[in-house]
C-alpha cells in the first residue's frame, strides 16, 4: 500500500479515536513507542496513553488541513507522516493550529504501529 494511502487511513482513524475515546489509541502504540507532547517525553504504550487520556479537557475536535507522507526506509516499509491542522477543545473561543509527526513501523501485512509521535501546538 502506498505511503499516502496508509497516512490517510491512519490519520482518519487516529484523530477520530483521539476525539472520541483517547484510551482507544492504546492499540496503536507498543512498549518501544515514544511520544513527545510539547516539551514532555513518554516511552511505552501505557505511559503514552495515560498521558493522552489525562489531558485536561473534556471535548476536542481535530481538523486536518494537510497530511504529507513518505516511505522512511528503503526496505522495511516504515512511513513518516506530518500532519498540520487545527484543534478546538471544550469551550475555547478559536481553533489552535498544531503540527504532529508520526513514524509508523510495519508489523505484519498492512499493519503498522506508532514508533515515534511528536506533537506541538503552533503558538507564536
Placement of each model-derived feature along the sequence:
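Hydrophobic pocket/interface hotspot
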Residues: 14, 24-26, 48, 104
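Generic structural signal for secondary-structure transition and capping sites
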Residues: 23, 57-60, 109
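Short, well-ordered alpha-helical segments enriched in acidic and aromatic residues
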Residues: 5, 20-36
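Short beta-strand edge/turn micro-motifs at domain boundaries
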Residues: 75, 82, 88-124
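A solvent-exposed, acidic/Ser-Thr-rich amphipathic alpha-helical stretch
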Residues: 31-77
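Short, low-complexity N-terminal intrinsically disordered segments enriched in polar/charged residues
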Residues: 1-16
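Eukaryotic beta-rich interaction modules
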Residues: 9, 81-84
Amino acid at each position: 500500500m502506498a505511503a499516502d494511502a496508509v497516512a490517510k487511513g491512519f490519520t482518519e482513524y487516529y484523530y477520530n479515536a483521539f476525539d472520541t475515546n483517547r484510551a482507544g489509541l492504546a492499540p496503536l502504540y507498543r512498549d518501544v513507542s515514544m511520544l513527545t507532547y510539547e516539551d514532555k517525553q513518554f516511552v511505552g504504550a501505557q505511559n503514552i496513553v495515560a498521558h493522552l487520556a489525562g489531558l485536561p479537557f473534556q471535548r476536542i475536535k481535530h481538523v486536518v488541513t494537510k497530511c504529507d507522507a513518505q516511505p522512511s526506509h528503503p526496505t522495511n516499509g516504515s512511513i513518516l507522516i506530518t500532519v498540520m491542522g487545527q484543534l478546538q477543545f471544550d469551550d475555547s473561543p478559536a481553533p489552535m493550529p498544531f503540527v504532529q509527526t508520526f513514524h509508523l513501523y510495519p508489523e505484519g501485512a498492512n499493519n503498522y504501529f506508532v514508533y515515534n509521535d511528536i506533537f506541538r501546538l503552533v503558538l507564536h
